[in-house]
């Protein structure tokens, strides 16, 4: 007997078509799909169905990356499956180890790609192309996640519709094989914009907060997926070109989102941190997580989860990090973190910020102009203030504890503007331009900053005018400073721009080189040493900007592979670097061996 499961679109909007499956379940060898995709509206329904399957995988994807990274640790409430991820003892029985959730995405994409009539026209426009390209992009993204988690995986591009097809031997590919197989077709469509179905009403939470979904921002831009695959395979210039093309096409700047202490008086000449380590802050940085048609363009792609179980697929991430997004109660917790009293906090949270993360943030300088000063920029040991927003201190009863706020809205970010710019910095650095990478951290990538960016070498300016042409006459106006196109490090450190800030290329690089030397690295005064050190600086910035967003372990392993591919300190230097970062987790496996970075395949 055939068993067809109807696809449900996001937030419980059930499909009116029965021509595709969300979860492939069949009790015979007959094809259970209706291959006809000849209606123009089919594109929207199938695209939402594909994104529904992304929803079903996203919690696992976040937890695999964050539990195995260096920004989290377990506590007394942590469940066994999460503990096993954290100490690298997870077996195929671990509930978060499921390749199936990615192959479900892939098979849905394969079916759509195989059967969609891309020649359907409205006037002179091929109306099915944006959704077709979206299916290609999502499929490539899913394969990329599989390779990150499992190394070498089964690869197929035709839909599986029977038991015999499912059981047939499959071709095996690693990340390089995935790149070779999928990038050529993706490149044909890199200028195609994502589908846009307007704003979707997602209903209201159980405690009465309405939720709207910007449908354009739930899509995966093909250029960004391409850039990520190139970066994963150490093709740095190609990665940088993809990131630049997307930023240029969408005119995405590094916007001004900062955090500053609130004072009832003007900034003094000497700001001392409070002994408690907690600051009341003026917070513009968290505005970047607002998703609305009129909001900031920081969010590029996100996975919005349903407001309750009746409206679609829910997420367990807020609860694991300490927030009860699905409660029906209003908790008037005494919260010292500036959020409203209606926020619901969970003492029994299962994931803690690591001391490594706290130490990294606390070790940063905060830069400010004292009252009435035009040129003086001073330094205070306040630390990076993004931590004060990302990790909040909460008092509940007699217990004080920390919780992470990134998932309080029931959304999971895939791409932010800062994500793209930081990966661009990673690529530019490995191309041989650490000064260009530093510009993204310090000043923001803009031609109008050249007078201030005296650290840029002539060959770097030439590269940024020709190869990655931010500074070309054709593109320079797309990255102006009209809305303060500024460096990412300023989000948490404030005044990093310009020649008067203590945050300068030579000093920051020298500090990191000295740190590496203290760790026993044979540091010399060569361009290659500078590239390796700048890579560590970028890695630190990723920790502070993107903490707990579901990228960390993949970021660490990708960077470790960059280092292994560079002969500077030996072919296993990156693996040793990774193992040192994660040593505090007491992993049961030897992380100096790349094979131990991967999960067992079910």
Feature-to-residue mapping (PLM):
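Long, intrinsically disordered, low-complexity segments
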Residues: 20, 102, 210-214, 299, ...
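Membrane-proximal, proline-rich intrinsically disordered regions
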Residues: 20-72, 240, 577-602
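Conserved, well-structured interaction surfaces
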Residues: 39-46, 78-151, 166-180, 186-193, ...
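Elongated scaffold/linker segments in the mid-to-C-terminal portions of large proteins
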Residues: 47, 245, 252-451, 535, ...
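Short, surface-exposed recognition loops and adjoining beta-strand edges that mediate ligand/DNA contacts
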Residues: 61-69, 197-225, 232-324, 455-466, ...
């Amino acid at each position: 007997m055939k068993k067809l499961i109807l696809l449900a679109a996001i937030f419980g909007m059930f499909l009116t078509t029965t021509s595709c499956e969300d979860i492939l379940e069949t009790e015979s060898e007959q094809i259970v799909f209706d291959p006809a995709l000849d209606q123009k509206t089919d594109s929207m329904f199938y695209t939402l169905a594909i994104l529904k399957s992304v929803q079903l995988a996203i919690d696992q994807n976040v937890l695999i990356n964050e539990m195995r990274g260096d920004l989290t640790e377990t506590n007394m409430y942590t469940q066994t499956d999460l503990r096993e991820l954290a100490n690298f003892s997870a077996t195929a029985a671990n509930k978060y180890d499921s390749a199936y959730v990615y192959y479900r995405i892939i098979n849905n994409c394969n079916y759509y790609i195989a059967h969609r009539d891309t020649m359907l026209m409205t006037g002179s426009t091929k109306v099915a192309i944006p959704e077709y390209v979206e299916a290609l992009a999502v499929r490539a993204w899913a394969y990329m996640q599989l390779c990150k988690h499992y190394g070498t995986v089964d690869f197929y591009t035709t839909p599986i519709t029977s038991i015999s097809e499912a059981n047939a031997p499959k071709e095996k590919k690693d990340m390089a094989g995935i790149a070779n197989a999928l990038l050529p077709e993706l490149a044909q469509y890199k200028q195609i914009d994502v589908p846009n179905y307007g704003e979707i009403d997602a209903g209201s939470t159980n405690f009465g907060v309405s939720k709207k979904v910007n449908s354009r921002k739930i899509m995966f831009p093909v250029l960004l997926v391409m850039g990520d695959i190139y970066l994963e395979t150490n093709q740095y210039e190609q990665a940088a070109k993809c990131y630049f093309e997307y930023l240029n096409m969408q005119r995405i700047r590094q916007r001004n989102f900062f955090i500053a202490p609130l004072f009832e008086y003007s900034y003094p000449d000497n700001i001392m941190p409070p002994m408690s380590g907690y600051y009341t802050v003026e917070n513009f940085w968290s505005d970047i997580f607002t998703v609305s048609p009129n909001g900031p363009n920081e969010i590029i792609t996100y996975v919005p989860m349903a407001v309750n179980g009746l409206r679609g697929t829910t997420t367990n991430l807020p609860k694991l990090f300490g927030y009860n997004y699905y409660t029906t109660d209003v908790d008037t917790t005494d919260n010292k973190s500036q959020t409203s009293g209606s926020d619901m906090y969970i003492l029994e949270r299962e994931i803690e910020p690591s001391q490594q993360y706290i130490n990294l943030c606390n070790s940063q300088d905060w830069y400010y102009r004292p009252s009435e000063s035009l040129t003086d920029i001073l330094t205070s040991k306040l630390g990076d203030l993004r931590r004060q927003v990302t990790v909040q201190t909460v008092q509940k009863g007699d217990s004080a504890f920390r919780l992470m706020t990134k998932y309080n809205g029931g959304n999971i970010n895939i791409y932010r503007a800062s994500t793209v710019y930081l990966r661009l910095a990673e690529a530019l650095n490995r191309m041989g331009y650490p000064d260009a990478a530093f510009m993204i951290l310090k000043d923001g990538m803009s031609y109008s900053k050249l007078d201030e960016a005296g650290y840029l070498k002539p060959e770097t300016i030439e590269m940024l005018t020709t190869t990655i042409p931010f500074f070309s006459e054709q593109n320079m106006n797309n990255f102006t400073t009209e809305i303060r196109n500024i460096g990412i490090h300023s989000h948490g450190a404030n005044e990093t721009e310009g020649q008067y800030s203590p945050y300068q290329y030579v000093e920051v690089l020298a500090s990191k080189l000295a740190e590496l030397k203290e760790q026993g690295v044979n540091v010399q005064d060569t361009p290659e040493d500078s590239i390796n050190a700048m890579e560590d600086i970028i890695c630190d910035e990723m920790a502070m900007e993107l903490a707990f967003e579901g990228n960390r372990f993949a970021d660490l392993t990708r960077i470790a592979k960059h280092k292994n591919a560079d002969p500077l300190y030996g072919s296993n230097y990156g693996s040793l670097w990774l193992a040192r970062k994660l040593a505090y987790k007491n992993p049961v496996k030897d992380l100096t061996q790349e094979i131990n970075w991967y999960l067992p395949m079910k």
